[in-house]
From Swiss-Prot:
Induction: Accumulates upon infection by generalist herbivores such as Spodoptera littoralis. Mostly expressed in leaves and flowers, and, to a lower extent, in seedlings shoots. Transmembrane segments: none annotated. Residues 64-73 have a biased composition (Gly residues). This is Serine rich endogenous peptide 1. One of its GO terms (molecular function) is LRR domain binding. Keywords: Apoplast, Cell membrane, Cleavage on pair of basic residues, Membrane, Secreted, Signal. One of its GO terms (biological process) is response to insect. A motif (SCOOP motif) lies at residues 53-67. A motif (SxS motif essential for MIK2 binding) lies at residues 59-61.
Amino acid sequence: MGMSGSSGLVHVLMLLLLLSILFHHTESTLPSDSEQLSITGRRMMANYKPNTAVETPPSRSRRGGGGQNTGAD
C-alpha cells in the first residue's frame, strides 16, 4: 500500500486547505469579545431578581447534631 510522493503531498495540501477554511469560517462566525461580554451580561441580568428571598431547596438530611456531644462522659 505505497503512496507516491506527489500524491501524499496533494493529500497534505488538501487537508491544510480544508483546515484553514474551517478555522477561518468558525472565527468569523464567533462574536467579538465585547459582544460576548454583552451577551453574557444580559443572560446574568435575566436571572437576577431584585428584592426576593434566596431560594433554597428543603433539607433532605436528618436532624443535625447541633454540636452536642452524644457520648457518655
